[in-house]
Amino acid sequence: MLFSEVTVIQADGGLLSKAYVGIRDGRVAYLGTQRPAGDWGEELRGELLLIPGFFNSHTHVPMTLLRGYGDDMTLDRWLNDRIFPFEDKLTGEDVYWGSLLGIAEMLASGTVSFTDMYYFCHRIVQAVEESGIKANIGRGTSCFDPDRTFRELPAYADARELLRTAHGAAQGRILVDVSPHAEYTTRPDILADMAALAAEYGVRMHTQIGIASWRERV
């Protein structure tokens, strides 16, 4: 595909007028003000503005299914009375369709990549593979039991399996993070063990910090 004589906002904010942008194999293969040689297939000409895609740096994308479920509640009531009980009933199939819905909404608004933390992650991976978007995906991990270690949690086995099977998948569009849910839902020793797992695989960590006060509404 070739975009001809379009205006391009570049990643550094610079403006390129009457530009040509060539796409091959799903990637930008040419950017310049001279028409590139060769056959680029379909051509879209003029009166277009091309901008870099947006990156959504924190999502729980299957939670599109919970939109509007528990408005005007304090954070603790929203989580404990609505969200956690609802999530206990979710299936992998629910997570897959909720992910596809959220991904469709992101793509429609120009978001090309997102960073997600949830569970049934293999179904989120499936939705990402099928949709063409890019994503960092992590198995969200929390622990309220003072006697269980990280290795004893189901999330540990899930995280290792995700790292083994999905990191670098979909032609490199999918990366895997190690994802403690938040500092207030995960003990310090488990956070340390998760950091060690991330270091073992050379991947990033993704967590929630600076959470709103329990008194504030969501």
Name what the model sees in each region:
Residues M1-G38, L49-L50:
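N-terminal metal-binding scaffold of metallo-dependent hydrolase/deaminase domains
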Residues I124-R215:
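Metal-coordinating catalytic core of metallo-dependent amide/deamination hydrolases
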Residues L65-W97, K134-Y156, S213:
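Active-site gating loops and adjacent loop-to-helix segments of metal-dependent hydrolytic enzymes
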Residues T33-W40, Q126-E130:
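Short loop/helix-cap segments at secondary-structure boundaries that form the rim of catalytic
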Residues F54, V112, R204:
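Hydrophobic "anchor" residues on beta-strands that sit immediately upstream
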Residues V6, V21, G26, E47, ...:
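Divalent metal-coordination and catalytic microenvironments
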